[in-house]
């Protein structure tokens, strides 16, 4: 019987390594796919490990710039903070991984793709909905969800099948990282009352260890895209990396969040997103300077929906594409410079300027240079309040002073 091909999203960890052997037993030839999303792994080692475990082919693709420009950028422009806190670190990478899985599957003539998600997390939904949107004819296999083994049973299977056991397997934490940040769950973090231990963090310093003097960074934007740091131009992926180091040194971007998962449970996770939180803060301030009132007040409603769609795995949905078109239209004049103070866990905007600034000092000032037409206020108030006045007159309402 001829073997079928499956493309596996491969991380190099125990789950996806065991999945290679498990899929072989199901009569599949496995093609491993590992993406460089800026997590800092030794991906050359991961690529070779997949082959040593049993994959017939192994891909390692650097997608950092694509991730930055096509995924993280939209999240920044939409100020995506799920439940007001989480910048969608993992949720942003899943549609890109799904996209590459489908591309390699079509390229290799595979009939299926596979991922290493469990049956109780959000990522299984994000992967599978995205894959269905991109190629509804591919079979999707979720080995970890199907085998339902305990950790001990999985380790025993690995030993029986000569699958290398990672040296950090005794770590209590489950970590996911990319350019946009780092997420951490499990272990002591499963107790929402317990303070996160310092070894749960990697990208940021504890406040007591941060510098006692602030650091200032000037971020330049062109049409909503961050392009410079302190006058130096960077590709977006490098700008994010550089800002992660700068802001992380000052403890910016630590987030402790009990969130409502898509699958109906609550989970407690710790995030580190120094660049993401700094850029979102700076970008919002530049929008405040350059967007007209009606757009500035309407945009948060669109942002909320975009955030929900991304979190829920609907990146490739028609609604998300339509809302993205609106978002892009709002960014045309979001060009300028924002000065941010990094200090003791805070990214504080202290200045902003733009050639498209709608702030007119001569209209805003209370000095002798004031050019605002105060006489116009009387007529404006009369017309603006007219519906309320008429309603009160008709209904014989009396307003007590």
Curated annotation (Swiss-Prot):
It is found in: Cytoplasm. Disulfide bonds: none annotated. Pathway: Amino-acid biosynthesis; L-arginine biosynthesis; L-arginine from L-ornithine and carbamoyl phosphate: step 2/3. It comes from the Bacteria. The keyword Phosphoprotein does not apply. L-aspartate binds at residues 118, 122-123. GO terms for biological process: argininosuccinate metabolic process; L-arginine biosynthetic process; urea cycle. L-citrulline binds at residues 86, 122, 126, 174, 183, 259, 271. It catalyses: L-citrulline + L-aspartate + ATP = 2-(N(omega)-L-arginino)succinate + AMP + diphosphate + H(+). The keyword Coiled coil does not apply. Keywords: Amino-acid biosynthesis, Arginine biosynthesis, ATP-binding, Cytoplasm, Ligase, Nucleotide-binding. Its EC number is 6.3.4.5. One of its GO terms (cellular component) is cytoplasm. Pfam families: Arginosuc_syn_C, Arginosuc_synth. Its main location: cytoplasm. One of its GO terms (molecular function) is ATP binding. It is an enzyme of class 6 (ligase). ATP binds at residues 9-17, 116. Belongs to the argininosuccinate synthase family. Type 1 subfamily. Homotetramer. This is Argininosuccinate synthase. It comes from Bacillus cereus (strain Q1).
């Amino acid at each position: 019987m001829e073997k079928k091909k499956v493309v596996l999203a491969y991380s190099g960890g125990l789950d996806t390594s065991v999945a290679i052997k498990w899929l072989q037993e199901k009569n599949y030839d496995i093609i491993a796919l590992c993406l460089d999303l800026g997590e800092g792994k030794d991906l050359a080692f991961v690529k070779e490990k997949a082959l040593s475990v049993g994959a017939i082919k192994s891909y390692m693709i650097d997608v950092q710039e694509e991730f930055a420009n096509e995924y993280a950028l939209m999240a920044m422009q939409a100020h995506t903070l799920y439940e007001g806190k989480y910048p969608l670190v993992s949720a942003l990478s899943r549609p890109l991984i799904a996209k590459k899985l489908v591309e390699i599957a079509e390229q290799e003539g595979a009939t299926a793709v596979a991922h290493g998600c469990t049956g109780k997390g959000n990522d299984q939904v994000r992967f599978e909905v995205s894959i269905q949107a991109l190629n509804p004819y591919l079979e999707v296999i979720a080995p970890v969800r199907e085998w339902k083994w305990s950790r001990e049973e999985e380790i025993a299977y690995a030993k029986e099948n000569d699958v290398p056991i990672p040296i950090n397997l005794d770590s209590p934490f489950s970590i996911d990282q990319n350019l946009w940040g780092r997420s951490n769950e499990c272990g002591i973090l499963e107790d929402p009352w317990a303070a996160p231990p310092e070894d749960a963090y990697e990208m940021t310093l504890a406040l007591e260890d941060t510098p006692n003097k602030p650091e200032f960074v000037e971020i330049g934007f062109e049409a909503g895209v961050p392009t410079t740091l302190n006058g130096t131009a960077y590709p977006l992926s490098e700008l994010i990396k550089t800002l992660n180091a700068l802001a992380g040194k000052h403890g910016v971007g630590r987030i402790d969040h009990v969130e409502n998962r898509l699958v109906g449970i609550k989970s407690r996770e710790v995030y580190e997103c120094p660049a993401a939180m700094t850029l979102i803060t700076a970008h919002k301030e530049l929008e405040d300077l350059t967007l007209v009132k009606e757009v500035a007040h309407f945009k948060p409603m669109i942002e909320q929906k975009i955030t929900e769609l991304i979190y829920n795995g609907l990146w490739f949905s028609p609604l998300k594409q339509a809302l993205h078109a609106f978002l892009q239209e709002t960014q045309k004049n979001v060009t300028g410079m924002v000065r941010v103070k990094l200090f003791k866990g805070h990214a504080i905007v202290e200045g902003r300027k733009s050639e498209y600034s709608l702030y007119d000092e001569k209209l805003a000032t209370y000095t002798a240079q004031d050019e605002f037409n105060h006489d116009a206020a009387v007529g404006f108030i009369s017309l603006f309040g007219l519906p309320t006045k008429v309603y009160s007159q008709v209904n014989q309402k009396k307003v007590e002073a």
